[in-house]
Amino acid sequence: MAAKKQPRTKAAGKKAPPQRHQKQKAVARRPTPARKPSASRGPSTVHRKPSVAVRVKPYDVGPLTDWPAYDGPPLGAHVSTAGGVAEAPARADLIGATAMQIFTKTPNQWREPAITADEAAAFKAALANSGVRFTNSHDSYLINLASPDSAIRARSIDSFTRELERCHALGLDALCSHPGNFIDDRASGIARNADAITECLEARPGPTRLLMELTAGQGTVIGSTFEEMAELIERIPAALRRRVGVCLDTAHVYAAGYDLVGDYDGVWERFDAVLGLPRLGLIHLNDSKAPFGSRKDRHELIGVGTIG
């Protein structure tokens, strides 16, 4: 989330003091609380069909005593796990979230820490004492299950399998994953991606559902069209396919050419016809910095970008 360019003072020609990020209209305004440590964050996250979600920094929020009544599908955001995964549910409560996405590890490193029994127990206890009703993880940004490079693909399979282990240990509802980059040939990449997912799901059975995230279509990435995502999922054996669903990121699909502004109902009708609404497990609500059909993955705060 990029900070706004700061104005220069005319008198001294120096930059004005940094300003806080503007909160989105959906957030009730309140006094700014004491600053808390920052940590990793991701896109707004909601389970199934939300009405609105908000991207916020952990240190920008405090308890919301005036949070409006909400009884819809689980709705929330990506929250920090700084200090341990057991800290995340309380942070979700600070913003009134009933859905929560986390990283179970640092997403831009190959290091694969296991979740200990004590960590899992503490997380589950904290979750039970929170208002969160849906939890999911987002996997590592380094994973490429479609890679033609055997070493990268093997390392990706190992990392993805360990991510499933951590999700199962924590009892998470879902794991959100980006399809890989085919690099050489699209059809071969889709086949490699599906085979790798199959291998991982067979190796780690459990309750966590895998949600494949639709992409913006940049470079050689797989999964920017409903048809391509359907092909990927259909290549997974039927016995395992029931554990696989879809995550729709609004910024991604808009950049990929699905007109959420001019043909909102039509986009969902197409999704249902090709993938089926029962496969929809998660929506990432993001605005887009990039224009419609640009095939660029550039997130923006809701209401600020090209979706509006």
Predicted regions and their residues:
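Alpha-helix-loop-beta-strand connector modules within alpha/beta enzyme cores
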Residues: A117-S137, A194-P207, L232-P237, T306-G308
